[in-house]
């Protein structure tokens, strides 16, 4: 049972507390919106590059009594759009939940921002690997087409 207070009447105290919570929430949401807009600017800069290669880096590992997994930040196609995103990957249940960055859990967004430079480095590496792979396959296709053309001429 709560202790009896001899201060302001309860409704007045509750109203004051609610005003504080509302003001703090407004400030938090404004800061979070600005934060997410800046990540959106990175998306805007990446979009015309037309990379089309998914890439993820681990932000943190987690475990519970029945599961373990990791939280990641990445560049991938989420909801039909290439963007910076977040995902939580479960090792045991093999489930994966992903979000567009601005829609992900706030705690994950805050952690993930420290890994954006690493993500860009990894994305550059995967893009270079993709280029090498395409170049190799293109050479193979050129040989294949050349052989087919020679056979067709006979």
Role assignments for model-derived ranges:
Residues 2-63, 122-151:
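Contiguous, amphipathic alpha-helical segments that mediate oligomerization or scaffolding
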Residues 5, 19, 34-37, 68, ...:
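Arginine residue identity/basic-tract feature
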Residues 65, 69, 94-131:
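N-terminal amphipathic/basic membrane-interacting segments and domains
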Residues 21, 38, 78, 85, ...:
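Generic signature of intrinsically disordered, low-complexity segments enriched in small/polar residues
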Residues 40-98:
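Amphipathic, interaction-prone secondary-structure segments
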């Amino acid at each position: 049972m709560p202790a009896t207070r001899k201060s302001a009447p309860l409704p007045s105290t509750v109203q004051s507390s609610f005003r504080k919570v509302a003001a703090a929430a407004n400030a938090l949401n404004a800061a979070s919106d600005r934060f997410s807009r800046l990540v959106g600017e990175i998306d805007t800069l990446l979009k015309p590059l037309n990379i089309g290669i998914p890439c993820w880096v681990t932000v943190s590992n987690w475990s519970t009594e029945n599961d373990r997994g990791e939280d990641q930040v990445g560049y991938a196609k989420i909801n039909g759009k290439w963007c910076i995103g977040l995902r939580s990957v479960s090792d045991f249940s093999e489930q994966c939940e992903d979000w567009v960055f601005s829609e992900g859990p706030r705690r994950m967004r805050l952690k993930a921002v420290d890994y954006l430079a690493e993500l860009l480095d990894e994305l550059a590496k995967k893009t270079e690997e993709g280029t090498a792979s395409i170049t190799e396959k293109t050479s193979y296709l050129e040989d294949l087409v050349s052989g087919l053309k020679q056979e067709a001429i006979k």
